[in-house]
Amino acid sequence: MAKASQVVLSENEFYLIKAPNGKVLEVKNFNTENGAAIRLWDYAGHPWQQWKFVDAGEGRWRIQNRFTGKMMDLALGGVVEGTWLHQWGRTSGLSQCWALEPTRN
């Protein structure tokens, strides 16, 4: 898989978001409700493990789940270490906006 600095994002494609251990982000138990947890899990080709990057303007992206159509969201709008990720219907809040930055390695 290409590094983030090598990937050109397309709003028409779905992507896996992989951790260094090879696990991917997914909606836990393919739950379609607001507040459903997002977790790391073994890749199995499921649509609840696939994500679409939606341009939010100003260099930010919303990350939408293929299966549920909901956005990756910071629980309770949290901004501190340890804040949980969950999914939520699209809002205008910054808790659903993400900036992507290339890494050096």
Residue ranges of model-derived segments:
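Extracellular glycan-recognition/adhesion modules and their associated mucin-like linkers
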Residues: 2-32, 50-79, 97-105
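Surface-exposed turn/loop modules enriched in turn-prone residues
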Residues: 35-46, 82-91
